Amino acid sequence: MSEYKDTLNLPETGFPMRGNLANREPEMLERWYKEDLYGEIRKAKKGKKSFVLHDGPPYANGDIHIGHALNKILKDIIIKSKTLSGFDAPYIPGWDCHGLPIELMVEKKVGKPGQKVTAAEFREKCREYAAGQVEGQKESFKRLGIMGEWDKPYRTMDFATEANIIRALGKIASNGHLLKGFKPVHWCTDCGSALAEAEVEYKDKVSPSIDVRFKTADEAALLSKFELTEGHEGKGDVSIVIWTTTPWTLPANRAVCLRDDLEYVLIQVEGDNPERIIVAAELAKDVMDRAGIEHFHNLGFAKGADLELSQFQHPFYDFTVPAILGDHVTTDSGTGVVHTAPGHGQEDFAVGQKYNLEVANPVGSNGVYLPDTELFAGQHVFKANDAVVETLKEKGALLHHHAYEHSYPHCWRHKTPIIFRATPQWFVSMDQAGLRAKALESIKGVQWMPEWGQSRIEGMIEGRPEWCISRQRTWGVPIALFVHKETAELHPNTLELIEKVAKLVEEKGIQAWWDVDAAELLGDEAEQYEKVLDTLDVWFDSGVTHFSVVDAREEYNGNSADLYLEGSDQHRGWFQSSLISSIAMKGVAPYKQVLTHGFVVDGHGRKMSKSIGNVVAPKDVTNKLGADILRLWVASTDYTGEVAVSDEILKRSADAYRRIRNTARFFLANLNGFNPATDIVPAEEMVALDRWAVGRALAAQEEIIKAYDEYNIHAVTQRLMQFCSIEMGSFYLDVIKDRQYTAKQGGHAQRSCQTALYYIVEALVRWMAPIMSFTADEIWNEMPGEREKFVFTGEWFDGLFGLAEGEELNNEFWTEIQKVRGAVNKLLEAARAEKTIGGALQAELTLFADDALAAKINKLEDELRFVLLTSAAAVKPLSEKSDAAQATDIEGLFVEVKATEAEKCDRCWHHTPDVGTIAGHEKICGRCVSNVDGKGEVRKFA
């Protein structure tokens, strides 16, 4: 063998078998940034059709977690695939930089504003802290191979962005959507601030469930509503009974609410302490059972509408409250009579407005009753529940009391229960200028992926209250408005004033609002107006980035966003705040498509939790396995549902990666010595099997591009794996090894094969590039021929071709041959197991086939043996089937396997009768002699 070694085409490449990604990726990253890869992409795509994926900003606090990695990698895959499809697809990453979590971190370091530091100094410390957090997260994202404007990201605290956020507020106000109101809002007593809908999460909580008597203030008038017969009016006090799980709100009670069409029953409670109570007829038995009342009977009935404006005594204060009517009253639970505190509930507030009820709020921002709150002053509301229940007992107003577990709103930061609390706030009104209706209409024009996203956001927009955009915080964009001291009206020149403030903020940041003297902007009117000192909800900051970033950044060339891509929780967060603000400002949705991914869970479907110990940190994965493994994990998952990750799942991704890498390595190693400029074989002159392989690549490419276009990333990975492992690895690459290694160096048989390998790897490297970016770059640099510096600046390979129309050895033919090969392989395996043969090249095959199949197989002529990887293979009619022939799982095909008696060729290891018959080459076969000393063997089919 050694004397012929130099005549073989041995594979050789600088592309190593092991990726060693954790060590080599940082070196590649260094080169990408040194050679300005992102800038090169931008230059290459300048003037092409635009694609804008607008980045939803993560919060600038803490290390990135696996959910961040999933989100950013998905975005990067889509951007890179769009770039390869010929789009100009800039990516400007962003960060949300204002708000409470940053304030809390800074408070730990410097104390609260106004204590050890001034508010201005505190804001500066917040800015510094957020900037440091952005830098840390930025490096983590870059390590994942994500390309973007990392030197010029957007941060909601950039002066220009802060100024544009203020301009957005002005635009919303001028379009008639801004509203000031004293309304109940979600309030966290730990934050000391209002919360947005998206900052509220629901968890189970145990509360006191109480049924409370409100005695009638006019017994005769009330009883007359029930049309009782004389002498059957019953006896004892008359009360209407409410049910509540928030006893602490009873000091703010200003009404009891019924439903107009419900039937209410007057019940006589019998026994030593007779009384009469009113509840909804439907719920009467439940109420009696709950209260343990066994002896009672009905006295009469009345509709809710008949009881409207009846007066009842507050259970522990010296005033009366009316019975009012509301649609929100149900018979799902309770008594059918709803305790109404307009200062502590949105439905209560809405119905209270109709009846002009007082919006009482006896609770301070810290959750403690105000000093003038009778009976309960100075108590925290949740601790006061017991005190309220005790007071009700003392007053004889408590009918029943038990502990009740129910879903209750909690603060997403503190994980503590929140309250509804009426405070003066600024709102984006959903209805005063038709914003809700316009938003619902615009949703229909957006493509929601998955489709259920549409009904989800529609339901949320239909049911959502006014958007409370004001916060009583220090670190935030100011609500830069002037209101009249007496009328509370906005200044008539609000839009002009906002532009003046925005220009100041562009120059000096948000501190300019607190520093500027009102007289500088208002002149003589300054005495009549006061500055609003509230800050904007951070969801407003991020929600208006369609204006403050997309419309403002020159990289987008005035194009609006094509795609928003975030986790499915953003239907109630960023998707919604963006939609509402965009409709309020421009009358159109801010996006054309909205794509969501699920949350990351562990291998058992559990949430990531430090206490469980199942947290997978992106940094740990990149340090151990490399970013391409993490990227392949993302691309292998149906991200529309929950996305599972664990060491075992990542190991599977690493195994899949190795298979793809080994396929690429085979291609590169066998392109050794190939120069595309001089060695390409024209398609019509290529060996039939090589043409077929290029055709399979074309079919795969069409499916892969379609899947990328539809954001169906896991379908890309599945098709890529199928192509590498099945179509190439299990068949084509297996068959061509013999020809590639043993054919005449530089001869037609070898160059035809190399031409196919070259075309296929040109396509393959591009399919891989959006997903396994580091590995694709590595492959690109090992490929033969002149090429651009980076795979990412090009487009999909357009040099592939399919088999010609009407070609005899078409796709159907090769599919049939693969089936035959599969059937034969089973028998060869059995022969090996029985020690009839050592390896397949020690076998001689006779295939007994029916006429149709024999005609097909015979098209390969003497090259059938190369497809079957045996030293000899003959085809005979089925009628001549020998006794030794074995059935296969193909109808009409029997195969006889026997050990060859021919000598083994030292060079190609085939056993052929002509080994030793050629003078000067006694150890090799005639085919090898031709490949070493002659013109080279001729291959037409395989």
From Swiss-Prot:
Keywords for this protein: Aminoacyl-tRNA synthetase, ATP-binding, Cytoplasm, Ligase, Metal-binding, Nucleotide-binding, Protein biosynthesis, Zinc
Name of the gene: ileS
Protein name in UniProt: Isoleucine--tRNA ligase
Entry comment, domain topic: IleRS has two distinct active sites: one for aminoacylation and one for editing. The misactivated valine is translocated from the active site to the editing site, which sterically excludes the correctly activated isoleucine. The single editing site contains two valyl binding pockets, one specific for each substrate (Val-AMP or Val-tRNA(Ile)).
Protein family membership: Belongs to the class-I aminoacyl-tRNA synthetase family. IleS type 1 subfamily.
Cofactor binding mode and count: Binds 1 zinc ion per subunit.
Subcellular location: Cytoplasm
Function: Catalyzes the attachment of isoleucine to tRNA(Ile). As IleRS can inadvertently accommodate and process structurally similar amino acids such as valine, to avoid such errors it has two additional distinct tRNA(Ile)-dependent editing activities. One activity is designated as 'pretransfer' editing and involves the hydrolysis of activated Val-AMP. The other activity is designated 'posttransfer' editing and involves deacylation of mischarged Val-tRNA(Ile).
Binding site for Zn(2+): C905, C908, C925, C928
SUPFAM superfamilies recorded: Anticodon-binding domain of a subclass of class I aminoacyl-tRNA synthetases, Nucleotidylyl transferase, ValRS/IleRS/LeuRS editing domain
Residues given in the record as L-isoleucyl-5'-AMP binding sites: E566
Cofactors that this protein relies on: Zn(2+)
Renumbered ranges of motif 'HIGH' region: 58-68
Motif ('KMSKS' region): 607-611
EC number: 6.1.1.5
Predominant localisation class: cytoplasm
Biological classification of the source: Bacteria, Pseudomonadati, Pseudomonadota, Gammaproteobacteria, Vibrionales
GO BP terms: isoleucyl-tRNA aminoacylation
Binding locations of ATP: K610
Organism, scientific name: Vibrio parahaemolyticus serotype O3:K6 (strain RIMD 2210633)
Catalysis: reaction(s): tRNA(Ile) + L-isoleucine + ATP = L-isoleucyl-tRNA(Ile) + AMP + diphosphate
Family annotation (CDD domains): Anticodon_Ia_Ile_BEm, IleRS_core
